[in-house]
Design a protein with these regions (language model features):
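Single-stranded nucleic acid-binding surfaces, predominantly the OB-fold ssDNA-binding core
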Residues: 1-196
Length: 196
């Protein structure tokens, strides 16, 4: 179930009680999937999955899901916020945790470059990834090192292909802890080659 410009293969353990919901006359599951990195750190990701793809799901299940990274508008504390989740299209046999994302899209905001207090170059960017039927997903990206500098010099509207992992990152702002979901990019190329 590979799509040209948005593909994800993510395997991990279900760590929240699944909730069922209806959308457009179809029944879906929503749950959190925790994926271990090689470093030992963990990413806890949101998953939406049609029940046609996965009939039942329980906390503790080990799943390997193939699908797309999608963005949704979600109301949190009375404000509309961008929510990023894996939309599962296929279930595969779970062998080991993995987190692989390939995207092709367009920079839709000016990339934001900075150097961390530890001296590491970092660049945040928003990628618009087109879907069928004229819709787009807006997916936050984070680039590192020389790649961060290179991307920071790109213009809004530049088409790029990339590969990386979908990660969760928590931070504190105004005494409240928030979690963001973004793609930590490992490889990037300019243009629509999808050879990231």
């Amino acid at each position: 179930m590979r799509t040209k410009n948005n593909h994800a293969l993510i395997a991990g353990t279900v760590t929240s009680a699944p909730t069922a919901y209806m959308c457009c006359g179809e029944r879906f599951w929503s749950f959190e999937l925790t994926v271990m990195r090689q470093s030992g750190a963990a990413d806890t990701l949101e998953v939406n999955c049609p029940q046609l793809v996965l009939e039942t799901v329980e906390t503790g299940d080990k799943l390997c899901l193939e699908g797309q990274v999608r963005s949704y508008a979600k109301t949190i504390d009375g404000k509309s916020r961008l929510s990023v989740a894996l939309f599962a299209l296929k279930v595969q046999e779970h062998k080991a945790d993995c987190n692989e994302v390939e995207l092709e899209g367009y920079l839709c905001e000016k990339p934001e470059f900075r150097t961390t207090p530890r001296g590491r170059d970092i660049c945040y960017a928003m990628l618009a990834v087109n879907r069928e039927r004229g819709k787009s997903d807006y997916i936050p990206q984070v680039f590192w090192g020389r790649t961060a500098k290179r991307v920071s010099e790109m213009q809004v509207g530049t088409q790029i292909s990339l590969s990386g992992r979908l990660q969760s990152r928590s931070y504190t702002k105004k005494n409240a802890t928030r979690t963001v979901f973004e793609v930590s990019v490992g490889k990037v190329s300019e243009g629509g080659s999808n050879d990231a």
